């Protein structure tokens, strides 16, 4: 076979002309050192703050310290296989997590990967974990209730949609129980719930998931878990991941509720990362930006107006407001609310529910201290009937606590003081509620109505809860229309009150409640 040199040169020219040279420009660096999940990298001159970095073995990290001649990064997950001299590549992307309806009912890790053994999650959308909170113009005032189903909270420290209400207390005071009741109570309301577990034992998280499944709450809940055995970096980013998942619903004109359990452990994880990155320590060895750590997270919980929702959905959703309500949890040490992290979060949130060990041990559960628990914006969002009937509850409890302290020293009490003490005892007893036995608006209104009109004046304190339960059952069977009317209108008419007065008289004549 004879080869023609001209043909060969033409072929080579054609190949050169058709050659596509699309060079992928990605900055590469070299690992200098690896210690405790912190990697120092040389040569990443173009790295961004918070950028995802790719390590060998399909491992990712987060660029956190951008120094003159090196980058300090934190590894998201296992780091044992990373060694000195390994090549690190910039991805050019900020850390993103999957978002969407497909996540509802699933348990995922801090990066949105499923860990419940139910197969992959087929989401098409992702969103960055760090976002700027809605501005002043984009927001709408909080005026819709987020019912928790707990008498003590909904009557004294009401929570509104788009509010941030802190749950604070020592270990083992029922903080998680209050949050789980709030999640269970959203069943059938269309509110999507996100439960973020930070630094808890895997067995505790499994227990929470099991309880939510038992009460049919997993159907509207996403669980984001960063267990105690996982890297500090994952515990640090878990709340931001959960918040991004909640914002997906908020920005589409829906309502979402997010529980951070708990932010004390996130602050500890962040302190660990910061100290390993050699950032200067401040008070209690926390870094200087620990306030910003929580403020930028909690400011993202808000109620956004119709225009903002319309803008975010490109006109798909019109005339609807969206909200993300946050229930952050903080664990105190020996009731010290003046420590660094508790005071920070108290100042960021719109009120706090303070749970006390002494009340919990005395059997008053939820163990809410009515004196220092407040809701700064929830009053405007309270249901009309609960606002009207529950106004005297906080006052009755506060006066009772004060008088109870004095009555220990006084041997003879006048009639008015004795009556006030008895009333306070009954109110304290009726504010008790078992876990997962939430009440709707009408059932709560019924109890508050009975307290206000003196129906419990002749009921022994020990029998008050049984009396309440029996009377509720009596009204449910004999006068269901009253409960339906209150639930529908959010108010109690004079006609309903007359019906209830007659029902109470009839019930008392047939029910043996006296001691």
UniProtKB/Swiss-Prot annotation:
Keywords for this protein: ATP synthesis, ATP-binding, Cell inner membrane, Cell membrane, CF(1), Hydrogen ion transport, Ion transport, Membrane, Nucleotide-binding, Translocase, Transport
Name the record gives this protein: ATP synthase subunit alpha
Top-level taxon: Bacteria
Catalyzed chemical reaction(s): ATP + H2O + 4 H(+)(in) = ADP + phosphate + 5 H(+)(out)
Subcellular location: Cell inner membrane
Stored Gene3D superfamilies: 2.40.30.20, ATP synthase alpha/beta chain, C-terminal domain, P-loop containing nucleotide triphosphate hydrolases
Residues flagged as site, Required for activity: 373
Species whose genome carries this gene: Neisseria meningitidis serogroup C (strain 053442)
GO cellular component: plasma membrane; proton-transporting ATP synthase complex
Recorded name of the encoding gene: atpA
Topology relative to the membrane: Peripheral membrane protein
Assembly description: F-type ATPases have 2 components, CF(1) - the catalytic core - and CF(0) - the membrane proton channel. CF(1) has five subunits: alpha(3), beta(3), gamma(1), delta(1), epsilon(1). CF(0) has three main subunits: a(1), b(2) and c(9-12). The alpha and beta chains form an alternating ring which encloses part of the gamma chain. CF(1) is attached to CF(0) by a central stalk formed by the gamma and epsilon chains, while a peripheral stalk is formed by the delta and b chains.
């Amino acid at each position: 076979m004879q080869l023609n040199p001209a043909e060969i040169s033409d072929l080579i020219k054609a190949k050169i002309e058709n050659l596509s040279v699309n060079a992928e420009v990605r900055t590469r660096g070299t690992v200098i050192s690896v210690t405790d999940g912190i990697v120092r990298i040389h040569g990443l001159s173009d790295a961004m703050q918070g950028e995802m970095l790719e390590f060998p073995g399909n491992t990712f990290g987060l660029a956190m310290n951008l120094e003159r001649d090196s980058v300090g990064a934190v590894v998201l997950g296992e780091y044992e296989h990373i060694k000195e001299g390994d090549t690190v590549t910039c991805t050019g992307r900020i850390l993103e997590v999957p978002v969407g309806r497909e996540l509802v009912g699933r348990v995922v890790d801090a990066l949105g990967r499923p860990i419940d053994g139910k197969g992959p999650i087929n989401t098409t959308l992702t969103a960055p974990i760090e976002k700027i909170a809605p501005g002043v113009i984009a927001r709408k005032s909080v005026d819709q209730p987020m019912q928790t189903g707990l008498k003590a909270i909904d009557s004294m420290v009401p929570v509104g949609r788009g509010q941030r209400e802190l749950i604070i207390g020592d270990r083992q005071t029922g903080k998680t129980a209050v949050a789980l009741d709030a999640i269970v109570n959203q069943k059938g309301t269309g509110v999507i719930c996100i439960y973020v577990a930070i630094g808890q034992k895997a067995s505790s998280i499994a227990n929470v998931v099991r309880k939510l499944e038992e009460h049919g709450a997993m159907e509207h809940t996403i669980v984001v878990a960063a267990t105690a055995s996982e890297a500090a970096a994952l515990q640090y980013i878990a709340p931001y991941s959960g918040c991004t998942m909640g914002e997906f619903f908020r920005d589409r004109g829906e309502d979402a509720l997010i529980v951070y359990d708990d932010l004390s452990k996130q602050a500890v994880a962040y302190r660990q990362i910061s100290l390993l990155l050699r950032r200067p320590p401040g008070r209690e060895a926390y870094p200087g930006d620990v306030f910003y750590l929580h403020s930028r997270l909690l400011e993202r919980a808000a109620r956004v107006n119709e225009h903002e929702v319309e803008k975010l959905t490109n006109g798909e959703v019109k005339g609807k407001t969206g909200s993300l309500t946050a229930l952050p949890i903080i664990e105190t040490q020996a009731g010290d609310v003046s420590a660094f992290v508790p005071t920070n979060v108290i100042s960021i949130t719109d009120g706090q529910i303070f749970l006390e060990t002494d009340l919990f041990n005395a059997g008053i559960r939820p163990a809410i201290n009515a004196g220092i628990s407040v809701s700064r914006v929830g009053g405007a969002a309270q249901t009309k009937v609960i606002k009207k009937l529950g106004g005297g509850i906080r006052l009755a409890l506060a006066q009772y606590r004060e008088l109870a302290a004095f009555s220990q020293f006084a041997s003879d009490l006048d009639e008015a003081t004795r009556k006030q003490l008895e009333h306070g005892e009954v109110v304290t007893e009726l504010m008790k509620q078992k876990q997962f036995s939430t009440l709707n608006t009408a059932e709560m209104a019924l109890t508050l109505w009975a307290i206000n009109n003196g129906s419990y004046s002749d009921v022994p304190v020990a029998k008050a809860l049984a009396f309440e339960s029996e009377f509720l059952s009596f009204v449910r069977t004999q006068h269901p229309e009253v409960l339906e009317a209150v639930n529908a209108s959010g108010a109690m008419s004079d006609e309903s009150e007359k019906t209830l007065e007659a029902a109470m008289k009839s019930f008392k004549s047939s029910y043996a409640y006296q001691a």
